[in-house]
Amino acid sequence: MDKNQIIGISLISVLMLGYFGFMSTQTPETPVTTPPAITQPVQSDTVLLKSAATDTALKAQNQREYGDFAAAMVGEAKEYKLENKDVVVTLSTKGGTIKSVLLKNYFTWDKKQLFLFKQENNQLSLILNTNKKPVDLYSLYYAGVESKAGDKQVVTFKTDAGNGKTIEHTYTLGAAGFTVDYNLKAAGFGGELPNLPLTLDWREQVERIEYDSEQARVKSTVNYMAAEDGFDYLSEASKDRETETLSNVYWVSLKQKFFNSGFYIREGGTIPSATVTAYPMYSTLPNAPVNSEKFIKALEAQVQLPLEAVISGKAAYAFYFGPNDFKICKAVPAENYQKNVNLGWPLVSWINRFVVIPVFDGLKGVFSSFGLIIVILVLLIKLVLLPLSYKSFVSMAKMKALKPELDELKAKHGDDQQAIQMEQMQVYKQFGINPLSGCIPVLLQMPILLAMFNFFPNAIDLRGESLWWATDLSSYDEFAKLPFTIPFYGSHVSMFTLLMTISTLAYTWVNNQVSTVTGPMKYMSYAMPVVFLFVLNSFPAGLSFYYFVSNLVTIAQQLIIRRFVDEGQLRLQLEAKRDKNLSGDTTGGAPKKNRFMARMEEAMKQREQEQQFKKNIKKK
């Protein structure tokens, strides 16, 4: 580089530095507004170009993956509602499916609106297999149309897949009830689709809606009715993941303690194949919110729907979103859908179905207080069982009248229980007493006792109903909250359970006044009520209140019956019968021989002979 070039470059550098230095120190006379006006369009154009490029790329990707369904992958979400006196069903053009279901006449434990179905905690998909990628029909966008069919409301969602091919979802809701009819149709596809069933996958993160979240968690499961094996359900309290693969199923139901969401084929059809799953307690579904306070369990039902029915337009299904009410579920046109309401074992279920529920519903139609209804129910049951109670009391009174003879036997034989029992049987025979006559009436009352044990925990009518300090008769009454947890008892005090325990102890004391039971067995009868105090502390307040009232009525009944039974006169009658039997007097016919007593005598004689034989061997 020569001398002139060096000088030229140096001058240019000095001039440029001076220019930039001067410009940077100048204050503009007016605010600079030009740059935003110039640069904004540039930024907007950039964004638009990027957006257009993204849309183009997305459309191209959708076209490659979904073919004719690509156009339906984009759209605008719009809501439609189906409403009757019981439910509000919200539908969306995004997916052409159910967005939420509100039960109008029920509320959560904290008095909020009860949404039995919400998209936030329900993952619902309907997979259609195509020659390209499987398509989730509930991810497409549809056009919605509202219409009427008599007193029924109808919403139809339809999307165009090109070349005359359409997918159509139709939802119908009657003027009342909790059932939503659902029709699915795929038209114009001809033989383009592979002959594979559609898969409806329903995953629910069960939300807490009951006060007692532990009982609600235990009672949440998947119920189903199979054509061959009948009704069954996944283990409710299992700590492991429970899964069953089923065939020919009438319906599946994601059941909670007092409500259920079900799916079934209309007109008596069956689901060819289904897989149901109950996830462990406190578990969550994939992509579901994790909140142990809000969500209590995770359930899933995956059903296979024949493609042929969808293509032919004969795919007629239905959803049920409602209470576990026996009468309501019985009216659902699905095979034995009332099985979602647990009424107990066969005999107990029969009593609840044909006796308890009709009587309870009848009382409910007359009285508004459920406390009063329970009291009247107790009185009616005790009135029906009065003959059995009277017979049981008289039998115990007879046994007590023989106490002098029985005491003599104990003094005579000491600790030789076998000898005592043998002679006791002879005494009973002489006096014409069947020692089991007092037990049989009690045993006959057991089915009713068990019926109540199954009825009250599952009676949705008691849900949210208050009585005195109990705010919800379907849950335990928390009279006091303990600052600690007692093993097998809990951290709360149920006053109705405490009253039930005290009344049971009182009844036991009254009953022991006419009982011949002595020794450890007598004191054991006082231990059982204490056990029930622990067992029933977390059971529904309605059940504990029923047992409490039942005990009070039974005590009063015992005291009244005692006034009409003259124990002295009863003793004279027994002695007369003994004298008659010992004299061989058969006037009026020989006494009937009790087969059971005869068998007991024979068994005791055989046992005595065996023991005598063993003693003889030892002596040798």
Curated annotation (Swiss-Prot):
GO biological process, one term: protein transport
rRNA-binding among keywords: no
Membrane-spanning ranges: 5-25, 343-363, 366-386, 436-456, 482-502, 529-549
Chief localisation class: membrane
Record keywords: Cell inner membrane, Cell membrane, Chaperone, Membrane, Protein transport, Transmembrane, Transmembrane helix, Transport
Gene Ontology terms: cellular component: plasma membrane
Subcellular location: Cell inner membrane
GO molecular function: membrane insertase activity
Membrane-protein topology: Multi-pass membrane protein
Signal sequence extent: none
Keyword Electron transport recorded: no
Homology family: Belongs to the OXA1/ALB3/YidC family. Type 1 subfamily.
Subunit and partners: Interacts with the Sec translocase complex via SecD. Specifically interacts with transmembrane segments of nascent integral membrane proteins during membrane integration.
Matching HAMAP family: YidC_type1 (MF_01810)
Record function comment: Required for the insertion and/or proper folding and/or complex formation of integral membrane proteins into the membrane. Involved in integration of membrane proteins that insert both dependently and independently of the Sec translocase complex, as well as at least some lipoproteins. Aids folding of multispanning membrane proteins.
Protein name: Membrane protein insertase YidC
Source species of the chain: Cytophaga hutchinsonii (strain ATCC 33406 / DSM 1761 / CIP 103989 / NBRC 15051 / NCIMB 9469 / D465)
Annotated gene: yidC
